[in-house]
Amino acid sequence: MDLWTALQALILGVVEGLTEFLPISSTGHQIIVADLLDFGGERAMAFNIIIQLGAILAVVWEFRRKILDVVIGLPTQPSARRFTANLLIAFLPAVVLGVIFADLIHHYLFNPITVAAALVVGGIVMLWAEQRQHEVHAETVDEIRWTDALKIGFAQCLAMIPGTSRSGSTIIGGLLFGLSRKTATEFSFFLAMPTMVGAAVYSGYKYRDLFVPADFPVFAIGFVTAFIFAMIAVRGLLKFIGSHSYAAFAWYRIVFGLVILATWQFGWVDWTAAQP
Protein backbone atom coordinates (compact mmCIF):
# COMPACT_ATOMS: atom_id res chain seq x y z
CA MET A 1 0.00 0.00 0.00
CA ASP A 2 1.53 3.30 -1.10
CA LEU A 3 1.06 6.66 0.60
CA TRP A 4 -1.45 7.94 -1.96
CA THR A 5 -3.69 4.90 -1.55
CA ALA A 6 -3.58 5.31 2.23
CA LEU A 7 -4.50 8.99 1.85
CA GLN A 8 -7.40 8.10 -0.44
CA ALA A 9 -8.68 5.62 2.13
CA LEU A 10 -8.33 8.17 4.91
CA ILE A 11 -10.18 10.91 3.02
CA LEU A 12 -13.01 8.63 1.93
CA GLY A 13 -13.32 7.25 5.46
CA VAL A 14 -13.69 10.78 6.79
CA VAL A 15 -16.29 11.60 4.13
CA GLU A 16 -18.29 8.45 4.92
CA GLY A 17 -18.16 9.03 8.66
CA LEU A 18 -19.19 12.67 8.50
CA THR A 19 -21.94 12.29 5.90
CA GLU A 20 -23.56 8.91 6.57
CA PHE A 21 -25.89 10.13 9.30
CA LEU A 22 -26.24 13.75 8.26
CA PRO A 23 -29.10 14.47 5.82
CA ILE A 24 -26.72 15.39 2.99
CA SER A 25 -26.21 12.00 1.25
CA SER A 26 -23.13 9.98 2.03
CA THR A 27 -23.43 8.04 -1.24
CA GLY A 28 -23.56 11.29 -3.19
CA HIS A 29 -20.47 12.63 -1.49
CA GLN A 30 -18.65 9.32 -1.94
CA ILE A 31 -19.36 9.30 -5.68
CA ILE A 32 -18.13 12.86 -6.12
CA VAL A 33 -15.07 12.63 -3.87
CA ALA A 34 -14.07 9.20 -5.20
CA ASP A 35 -14.23 10.59 -8.73
CA LEU A 36 -12.06 13.57 -7.78
CA LEU A 37 -9.55 11.21 -6.13
CA ASP A 38 -9.71 8.77 -9.05
CA PHE A 39 -10.59 5.98 -6.64
CA GLY A 40 -12.74 3.47 -8.48
CA GLY A 41 -12.98 -0.04 -9.78
CA GLU A 42 -13.49 -3.28 -7.89
CA ARG A 43 -11.44 -2.19 -4.88
CA ALA A 44 -13.74 0.82 -4.43
CA MET A 45 -16.86 -1.37 -4.36
CA ALA A 46 -15.41 -3.55 -1.60
CA PHE A 47 -14.01 -0.53 0.22
CA ASN A 48 -17.42 1.17 0.36
CA ILE A 49 -18.96 -1.88 2.01
CA ILE A 50 -16.29 -1.87 4.71
CA ILE A 51 -16.48 1.83 5.55
CA GLN A 52 -20.26 1.68 5.83
CA LEU A 53 -19.84 -1.02 8.45
CA GLY A 54 -17.43 1.26 10.29
CA ALA A 55 -20.01 4.04 10.28
CA ILE A 56 -22.86 1.84 11.48
CA LEU A 57 -20.72 0.47 14.30
CA ALA A 58 -20.47 4.03 15.61
CA VAL A 59 -24.27 4.23 15.92
CA VAL A 60 -24.44 0.83 17.59
CA TRP A 61 -21.89 2.01 20.12
CA GLU A 62 -23.60 5.37 20.69
CA PHE A 63 -26.99 3.75 21.35
CA ARG A 64 -25.70 0.57 22.99
CA ARG A 65 -27.71 1.14 26.19
CA LYS A 66 -31.00 1.51 24.34
CA ILE A 67 -30.19 -1.54 22.22
CA LEU A 68 -29.35 -3.58 25.32
CA ASP A 69 -32.55 -2.45 27.05
CA VAL A 70 -34.61 -3.52 24.04
CA VAL A 71 -32.92 -6.91 23.76
CA ILE A 72 -33.34 -7.62 27.47
CA GLY A 73 -36.92 -6.35 27.47
CA LEU A 74 -38.17 -8.29 24.44
CA PRO A 75 -39.59 -11.23 26.44
CA THR A 76 -41.49 -9.10 28.97
CA GLN A 77 -41.82 -5.46 27.87
CA PRO A 78 -44.48 -4.46 25.30
CA SER A 79 -42.59 -1.24 24.53
CA ALA A 80 -39.48 -3.22 23.53
CA ARG A 81 -41.52 -5.52 21.29
CA ARG A 82 -43.32 -2.56 19.71
CA PHE A 83 -40.03 -0.75 19.07
CA THR A 84 -38.53 -3.85 17.44
CA ALA A 85 -41.64 -4.43 15.34
CA ASN A 86 -41.56 -0.82 14.14
CA LEU A 87 -37.94 -1.20 13.03
CA LEU A 88 -38.76 -4.36 11.10
CA ILE A 89 -41.80 -2.74 9.48
CA ALA A 90 -39.77 0.29 8.43
CA PHE A 91 -36.95 -1.94 7.18
CA LEU A 92 -39.02 -4.19 4.90
CA PRO A 93 -39.81 -1.77 2.02
CA ALA A 94 -36.10 -1.13 1.45
CA VAL A 95 -35.42 -4.88 1.41
CA VAL A 96 -38.04 -5.61 -1.23
CA LEU A 97 -37.39 -2.63 -3.50
CA GLY A 98 -33.64 -2.82 -2.96
CA VAL A 99 -33.42 -6.39 -4.21
CA ILE A 100 -35.55 -5.54 -7.25
CA PHE A 101 -34.02 -2.23 -8.32
CA ALA A 102 -30.52 -1.99 -6.80
CA ASP A 103 -28.58 -3.10 -9.88
CA LEU A 104 -30.59 -0.91 -12.26
CA ILE A 105 -30.18 2.14 -10.06
CA HIS A 106 -26.46 1.53 -9.61
CA HIS A 107 -25.99 1.18 -13.37
CA TYR A 108 -28.01 4.19 -14.51
CA LEU A 109 -28.06 6.67 -11.63
CA PHE A 110 -24.70 6.39 -9.85
CA ASN A 111 -23.12 9.47 -11.39
CA PRO A 112 -22.35 12.99 -10.12
CA ILE A 113 -25.04 14.71 -12.21
CA THR A 114 -27.82 12.60 -10.70
CA VAL A 115 -26.31 13.22 -7.27
CA ALA A 116 -26.24 16.99 -7.82
CA ALA A 117 -29.86 17.11 -8.98
CA ALA A 118 -31.01 14.97 -6.04
CA LEU A 119 -29.08 17.16 -3.60
CA VAL A 120 -30.87 20.27 -4.85
CA VAL A 121 -34.34 18.72 -4.95
CA GLY A 122 -33.86 17.12 -1.54
CA GLY A 123 -32.71 20.42 -0.08
CA ILE A 124 -35.81 22.19 -1.35
CA VAL A 125 -38.07 19.47 0.08
CA MET A 126 -36.22 19.70 3.39
CA LEU A 127 -36.82 23.46 3.59
CA TRP A 128 -40.49 22.95 2.80
CA ALA A 129 -40.85 20.22 5.44
CA GLU A 130 -39.19 22.37 8.11
CA GLN A 131 -41.46 25.34 7.39
CA ARG A 132 -44.61 23.27 7.18
CA GLN A 133 -46.77 23.18 10.28
CA HIS A 134 -47.36 19.63 11.47
CA GLU A 135 -48.80 18.09 14.60
CA VAL A 136 -46.40 16.05 16.72
CA HIS A 137 -47.80 12.85 18.25
CA ALA A 138 -44.52 11.01 18.95
CA GLU A 139 -42.06 12.70 21.30
CA THR A 140 -39.98 9.53 21.79
CA VAL A 141 -39.16 6.51 19.64
CA ASP A 142 -41.35 4.37 21.92
CA GLU A 143 -44.42 6.41 20.90
CA ILE A 144 -44.06 5.76 17.16
CA ARG A 145 -47.03 3.93 15.62
CA TRP A 146 -46.60 1.06 13.18
CA THR A 147 -48.24 3.13 10.46
CA ASP A 148 -45.64 5.85 11.02
CA ALA A 149 -42.89 3.24 10.76
CA LEU A 150 -44.29 1.89 7.49
CA LYS A 151 -44.50 5.34 5.92
CA ILE A 152 -40.96 6.15 7.05
CA GLY A 153 -39.86 2.85 5.52
CA PHE A 154 -41.26 3.86 2.15
CA ALA A 155 -39.66 7.29 2.51
CA GLN A 156 -36.33 5.54 3.06
CA CYS A 157 -36.68 3.88 -0.34
CA LEU A 158 -36.24 7.28 -1.99
CA ALA A 159 -32.64 7.13 -0.80
CA MET A 160 -31.97 4.45 -3.39
CA ILE A 161 -31.50 7.44 -5.70
CA PRO A 162 -27.94 8.64 -4.98
CA GLY A 163 -27.86 12.15 -3.59
CA THR A 164 -31.24 11.85 -1.88
CA SER A 165 -29.84 10.73 1.51
CA ARG A 166 -31.14 7.82 3.57
CA SER A 167 -31.05 9.83 6.79
CA GLY A 168 -32.57 12.85 5.06
CA SER A 169 -35.46 10.81 3.66
CA THR A 170 -36.25 9.13 6.97
CA ILE A 171 -35.84 12.26 9.10
CA ILE A 172 -37.96 14.47 6.86
CA GLY A 173 -40.47 11.65 6.49
CA GLY A 174 -40.62 11.39 10.26
CA LEU A 175 -41.25 15.12 10.61
CA LEU A 176 -44.04 15.03 8.04
CA PHE A 177 -45.64 11.99 9.67
CA GLY A 178 -45.84 13.48 13.18
CA LEU A 179 -42.54 12.73 14.90
CA SER A 180 -40.64 15.37 16.83
CA ARG A 181 -37.32 16.43 15.35
CA LYS A 182 -35.34 14.52 17.99
CA THR A 183 -37.50 11.40 17.64
CA ALA A 184 -37.29 11.45 13.83
CA THR A 185 -33.52 11.74 14.05
CA GLU A 186 -33.10 8.95 16.59
CA PHE A 187 -35.43 6.61 14.70
CA SER A 188 -33.43 7.31 11.56
CA PHE A 189 -30.29 6.23 13.40
CA PHE A 190 -31.91 3.03 14.68
CA LEU A 191 -33.36 2.22 11.26
CA ALA A 192 -29.89 2.62 9.77
CA MET A 193 -28.69 -0.41 11.72
CA PRO A 194 -30.72 -3.17 10.01
CA THR A 195 -30.78 -1.30 6.70
CA MET A 196 -27.05 -0.72 6.39
CA VAL A 197 -26.03 -4.05 7.90
CA GLY A 198 -28.44 -5.84 5.58
CA ALA A 199 -27.14 -3.94 2.56
CA ALA A 200 -23.54 -4.62 3.56
CA VAL A 201 -24.15 -8.35 4.04
CA TYR A 202 -26.00 -8.59 0.72
CA SER A 203 -23.34 -6.65 -1.17
CA GLY A 204 -20.52 -8.37 0.67
CA TYR A 205 -21.79 -11.79 -0.35
CA LYS A 206 -22.52 -10.67 -3.90
CA TYR A 207 -19.05 -9.18 -4.35
CA ARG A 208 -17.20 -11.55 -2.03
CA ASP A 209 -14.53 -12.24 -4.66
CA LEU A 210 -13.45 -8.58 -4.50
CA PHE A 211 -12.16 -8.89 -0.94
CA VAL A 212 -8.50 -9.77 -1.33
CA PRO A 213 -5.94 -9.84 1.53
CA ALA A 214 -3.73 -7.28 -0.22
CA ASP A 215 -6.44 -4.64 0.27
CA PHE A 216 -7.06 -5.31 3.96
CA PRO A 217 -4.75 -2.48 5.16
CA VAL A 218 -6.68 -0.03 2.96
CA PHE A 219 -9.97 -1.36 4.33
CA ALA A 220 -8.71 -1.02 7.90
CA ILE A 221 -7.81 2.65 7.43
CA GLY A 222 -11.22 3.41 5.97
CA PHE A 223 -13.11 1.39 8.60
CA VAL A 224 -11.44 3.01 11.60
CA THR A 225 -11.64 6.51 10.13
CA ALA A 226 -15.32 6.11 9.26
CA PHE A 227 -16.09 4.84 12.78
CA ILE A 228 -14.35 7.78 14.48
CA PHE A 229 -15.89 10.49 12.32
CA ALA A 230 -19.34 8.90 12.32
CA MET A 231 -19.25 9.00 16.11
CA ILE A 232 -18.39 12.69 15.96
CA ALA A 233 -21.18 13.35 13.45
CA VAL A 234 -23.86 11.45 15.39
CA ARG A 235 -23.09 13.18 18.68
CA GLY A 236 -22.81 16.54 16.98
CA LEU A 237 -26.12 16.17 15.16
CA LEU A 238 -28.03 15.12 18.28
CA LYS A 239 -26.68 18.18 20.06
CA PHE A 240 -27.31 20.47 17.08
CA ILE A 241 -30.99 19.59 16.63
CA GLY A 242 -31.69 20.45 20.25
CA SER A 243 -31.74 24.11 19.28
CA HIS A 244 -31.66 24.22 15.46
CA SER A 245 -33.69 23.06 12.48
CA TYR A 246 -32.40 21.21 9.44
CA ALA A 247 -32.45 24.35 7.30
CA ALA A 248 -28.66 24.69 7.35
CA PHE A 249 -28.28 21.20 5.89
CA ALA A 250 -30.93 21.98 3.28
CA TRP A 251 -29.05 25.07 2.11
CA TYR A 252 -25.78 23.15 2.07
CA ARG A 253 -27.37 20.53 -0.19
CA ILE A 254 -28.75 23.15 -2.54
CA VAL A 255 -25.51 25.13 -2.81
CA PHE A 256 -23.32 22.03 -3.17
CA GLY A 257 -25.62 20.55 -5.81
CA LEU A 258 -25.74 23.79 -7.78
CA VAL A 259 -21.94 24.06 -7.70
CA ILE A 260 -21.62 20.55 -9.16
CA LEU A 261 -24.20 21.34 -11.84
CA ALA A 262 -22.46 24.62 -12.67
CA THR A 263 -19.06 22.97 -13.07
CA TRP A 264 -20.68 20.46 -15.41
CA GLN A 265 -22.70 23.02 -17.38
CA PHE A 266 -19.71 25.29 -17.99
CA GLY A 267 -17.37 22.41 -18.72
CA TRP A 268 -15.03 23.03 -15.80
CA VAL A 269 -15.23 19.38 -14.72
CA ASP A 270 -16.17 16.45 -16.96
CA TRP A 271 -18.50 14.78 -14.47
CA THR A 272 -20.14 12.73 -17.22
CA ALA A 273 -16.93 10.73 -17.48
CA ALA A 274 -17.29 9.54 -13.88
CA GLN A 275 -17.62 5.82 -13.34
CA PRO A 276 -19.83 4.32 -10.59
Curated annotation (Swiss-Prot):
It is a multi-pass membrane protein. The chain crosses the membrane at residues 43-63, 85-105, 109-129, 184-204, 214-234, 254-274. One of its GO terms (biological process) is peptidoglycan biosynthetic process. It is found in: Cell inner membrane. GO terms for cellular component: plasma membrane. It catalyses: di-trans,octa-cis-undecaprenyl diphosphate + H2O = di-trans,octa-cis-undecaprenyl phosphate + phosphate + H(+). One of its GO terms (molecular function) is undecaprenyl-diphosphatase activity. Keywords: Antibiotic resistance, Cell inner membrane, Cell membrane, Cell shape, Cell wall biogenesis/degradation, Hydrolase, Membrane, Peptidoglycan synthesis, Transmembrane, Transmembrane helix. Its EC number is 3.6.1.27. It holds the Pfam family BacA. Bacitracin is thought to be involved in the inhibition of peptidoglycan synthesis by sequestering undecaprenyl diphosphate, thereby reducing the pool of lipid carrier available. Belongs to the UppP family. Catalyzes the dephosphorylation of undecaprenyl diphosphate (UPP). Confers resistance to bacitracin. HAMAP family: Undec_diphosphatase (MF_01006). This is Undecaprenyl-diphosphatase 1. It comes from Pseudomonas fluorescens (strain Pf0-1).
